[in-house]
Curated annotation (Swiss-Prot):
Reported function: The RecF protein is involved in DNA metabolism; it is required for DNA replication and normal SOS inducibility. RecF binds preferentially to single-stranded, linear DNA. It also seems to bind ATP.
Stated family: Belongs to the RecF family.
Keywords carried by this UniProt record: ATP-binding, Cytoplasm, DNA damage, DNA repair, DNA replication, DNA-binding, Nucleotide-binding, SOS response
Protein name: DNA replication and repair protein RecF
Name of encoding gene: recF
InterPro entries noted in UniProt: DNA-binding_RecF, DNA-binding_RecF_CS, P-loop_NTPase, Rad50/SbcC_AAA, RecF_2
Broad class of the protein's primary localization: cytoplasm
Biological source species: Chlorobaculum tepidum (strain ATCC 49652 / DSM 12025 / NBRC 103806 / TLS) (Chlorobium tepidum)
Record's keyword annotation contains ATP-binding: yes
Record: residues binding ATP: 30-37
Protein's UniProt keywords contain ATP-binding: yes
GO molecular function, one term: ATP binding
Gene3D superfamilies: P-loop containing nucleotide triphosphate hydrolases, RecF/RecN/SMC, N-terminal domain
GO cellular component labels: cytoplasm
Length: 368
């Protein structure tokens, strides 16, 4: 996948900006606060229908303005053109058109433009709350597996209904009967989600080991998927997983009624990251944690290509600020051999064949 052009108006601190990246590496450079990251966020909007920081569209609207627009053009590896147009105003909410057809559901667009990002704020994947790690794995899988996306949305709806029932003041007999129905529905979808996640992590970890060879010290990376199945985590048979879930919910029933929330399921699962069998969050330096996340993003690029047949666009925000120059340079060179890479930095980076865009004066150039 390749971004051919993008124009943004009243987006973050940009009144109007037009950007045409190169086919390989493009370095967006400029002073801090000049809006480099905003360009990447606009591209991310076109790929995943939201910015880096989530679904609060209002925060991307330039102060004092009533509407922001993003217009972009992409070309797939098969030469298929895709045009994405996004408008947002607090009065009319967000509208997304793909090839001039308005999306009825934003989720239907996920996977059309595969995209891998690295931003400093994503360090929360390593050292933040479990929800951040679940978001990483869900966003990755949803870009190539539409059934998983559908299952995830259905699971969230059933979970919301089940939590509402647990919090209701209805007759206990009514709650008990309805709870059995919702639990059966939740177990069926939860099993599908857990199986896909486990298979993803298993293959992803094997690929991560190969990518990690370019990082110094020859460390051995691994990822552990922690599910609410407890000591049954190694199960891969659907019927057995369903049985364990049913037993788990039966055991937790009184606690759930008391706490008024669902206490088991994929929404409570987590990932643990290791280097040489030592948990990264506890024992690794900040530099090692950052390098591990970068390696994960490199792995994800290859994984999405393998799963979908389309090379993702790679967006790297402020990659060089805290990462070893050799490691970051190797990463960029490796990614560039596989697709389009767009990087932000405060200073212009040297490199053969790199395209440049100065966000301070909106000028483009290219190294010979």
């Amino acid at each position: 996948m390749r971004l051919d052009s993008i124009s943004i108006a009243n987006f973050r601190n940009h009144t109007l900006l037009e950007f045409e990246p190169g086919h390989s590496i493009t370095n967006i450079y400029g002073r801090n606060g000049s809006g480099k990251t905003s360009i990447l966020e606009a591209i991310h909007y076109c790929a995943l229908t939201r910015g880096f920081s989530g679904n609060n569209d209002r925060e991307y609207l330039k102060f004092g303005e009533e509407l922001f627009t993003i217009r972009s053009s992409f070309t797939s590896g098969q030469g298929i053109a895709t045009k994405v147009s996004i408008t947002y105003s607090p009065k009319r909410e967000k509208r997304i058109l793909v090839n001039e057809q308005e999306l009825q559901t934003f989720s239907s667009h996920i996977g059309t433009i595969p995209c891998v990002t690295f931003t400093p704020r994503e360090m929360v994947i390593i050292n933040g709350a479990p929800a951040e790690r679940r978001r990483f794995i869900d966003t990755a899988i949803c870009q190539y597996d539409r059934k998983y996306l559908s299952d995830l949305l259905l699971y969230r709806r059933i979970l919301q209904q089940r939590n509402a029932l647990l919090s209701s003041e209805q007759d206990p007999r009514v709650i008990d009967s309805a709870l059995d129905v919702l639990t059966d529905q939740l177990v069926a979808i939860a099993t599908e989600i857990v199986l896909v996640r486990k298979r993803f992590i298993e293959h992803f970890t094997s690929m991560l080991g190969g990518v990690y060879q370019w990082i110094p010290e020859g460390a051995e990376p691994s990822i552990l998927y922690q599910s609410s199945l407890g000591h049954h985590e190694n199960l891969y048979e659907k019927d057995k997983i369903q049985q364990v879930f049913r037993e788990r919910f039966e055991t937790l029933k009184q606690q759930e009624l008391q706490r008024r929330q669902t206490l088991a399921g994929p929404h409570r699962d987590d990932l643990q990251f290791y280097l040489n069998k030592r948990e990264i969050r506890k024992y690794a330096s900040q530099g090692q944690q950052r390098a591990f996340l970068v390696a994960m993003k490199m792995t994800l690029q290859g994984y999405l290509y393998e799963a979908s047949g389309e090379i993702p666009i790679t967006l790297l925000d402020d990659l060089f600020s805290e990462l070893d120059e050799v490691v970051s340079g190797t990463m960029v060179e490796t990614l560039a051999t596989k697709g389009q890479v767009i990087i932000t930095s405060t200073e212009k980076k040297k490199g053969k064949g790199i395209s440049f865009f100065s966000v301070d004066d909106y000028k483009s150039s290219k190294e010979p």
